[in-house]
Each structure stands twice: as C-alpha cells, then as structure tokens.
Design a protein with these regions (language model features):
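A generic secondary-structure signal
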Residues: 17-25, 55-59, 84-88, 151-152, ...
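Short, acidic/polar
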Residues: 12-22, 74-85, 171
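Catalytic pocket-lining loop regions of alpha/beta-barrel enzymes
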Residues: 91-93, 103-211
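Alpha-helix capping and helix-coil boundary motifs
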Residues: 2, 10-14, 41-45, 75-77, ...
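Well-ordered, non-membrane alpha-helical segments in soluble/globular domains
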Residues: 14-16, 46-51, 145-148
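An N-terminally biased module of ancient metal coordination in phosphate/nucleic-acid-related enzymes
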Residues: 1-35, 40-44
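Short N-terminal micro-motifs specific to bacterial/archaeal maturation
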Residues: 6-9, 44, 69, 101, ...
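Active-site gating/metal-coordination segments in enzymes
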Residues: 28-133, 137-140
Length: 211
C-alpha cells in the first residue's frame, strides 16, 4: 500500500503487457532486476531467478537490460553466480538492497561482490536511505546510510557505485558522497519529483548534473 502499486502489477504482468505500458509512457528501455530480496528461507523474502530475467532480455534485447541481484549470505557461490550472469547471459550490472539483509554497504560480506564487479567492469547499484516495513513478519533496520559508501568508494576507486532512491531522509549525505567521489552517482527513482528535498533539486540543477 505504501508503494501505491496495483495488485495486478504486484502479482506480475506479462512481458508483452510491460512493453505495452512502456510504449504508452514513451520508455525505450528499462532495467530488469533479478532481485534478491532477503534470505531465501523466509516466507516474506524472494529471489528472482537470473534465468527468468535472462530469457526476457534474450526475447527483447533492444528493450530490456539485466541487473543481477546480490545476496551476501551466498558467499563465493553468489560471486560465481554473478560472474556467470555477466559472462554467459549478458547482465550489465549488479544490484542489492542492504536493508533486506541488515548489512550496511561497507560490511565485509559485500566486499567479494565489489571486487568481482571491478574485475568484470560492471557497476553496482544499491538502495540508500531508509527502508520501509514491507512485511510485518520481517521488519528490517534502515542500514543504508549513504555515508557508508565513503569507505567502499575509498577501497574500490575503480567501482562505479550508484545510490538509488535519492537517499531520503539522508539526501545531503548522498550528495556529499557523489560530490566527494568521482565513482559515486545518484539515481532519482522511487520518489516523485514533487517530494524531492530542495537540496537535491539544487544539486541536480547545478554542480551535480553529471552525477
């Protein structure tokens, strides 16, 4: 309810319906995320199979690009799966939600994935800012403070880090990280522009236009 997603969309639509909606909105291409939302064994969590997203991209390569979700509890098995997704299925980046695992972006369990992203020359995008209570049986702490990207950007200067969801309510921290580090960027998704903090509006209207 908080995300204002209609039931049909939440339960899943066909690729053809998605393309119809994209055309209606004049959207040429989108990312399809093989999201890993929490640990597999919990009923409130789910993993979108890499193969499912890879098949959609195979069918409509000019409309979809694939991002590989990350689960830090998978360890090196997850790192190897990421490599296969990129090398065998053409995934163009990695994606993760820190709060679903209650591990901030600078936690050591994410570092093998960062190293592999550098090796594969792909970016990683991650949610920054607060988390919601998506399921009452699985409340998660908000561990996505943008300041946590500081250590990651210092330790992996070759890694392109993309903070999604603007960083609200710590938007100024996200701006500071993008200003400090040439390899840190902000994505203005999730929140309608009318709700963007004024500091973010000023940032993208001025010295943050290329970040």
């Amino acid at each position: 309810d908080k995300m204002h997603v209609d039931r049909e969309t939440f339960e899943g639509i066909s690729l053809e319906e998605m393309l119809r909606r994209m055309d209606a909105a004049n959207i040429e291409r989108v990312f399809l995320v093989a999201a890993k939302v929490g640990v597999k064994h919990h009923p409130a969590c789910y993993h979108v199979p890499y193969d499912l997203v890879a098949e959609a991209v195979r069918r409509y390569p000019h409309r979809f690009s694939a991002l590989a979700g990350l689960d830090p509890t998978e360890g090196m098995d997850g790192v190897r799966a990421l490599e296969r997704a990129v090398k065998e299925h053409g995934f163009i980046g990695a994606h993760f939600y820190p709060h679903w695992f209650e591990l901030p972006p600078d936690h050591a369990k994410w570092y093998p994935f960062y190293a592999k992203c550098v090796e594969l020359d792909i970016p990683v995008q991650l949610q920054v800012g607060q988390s919601l209570v998506y399921d009452p049986t699985y409340p998660r702490r908000s561990v996505g403070r943008p300041i946590a990207l500081d250590a990651v950007a210092c330790d992996f200067p070759e890694l392109k880090l993309i903070g999604i969801h603007v960083g609200i309510p710590w938007t100024d921290e996200m701006i500071a990280m993008a200003w400090k580090h040439r390899n840190v960027f902000i994505v203005s998704d999730a929140h309608s522009p009318k709700y963007w903090p004024q500091s973010f509006v000023r940032y993208i209207d001025s010295y943050g236009q290329d970040k």
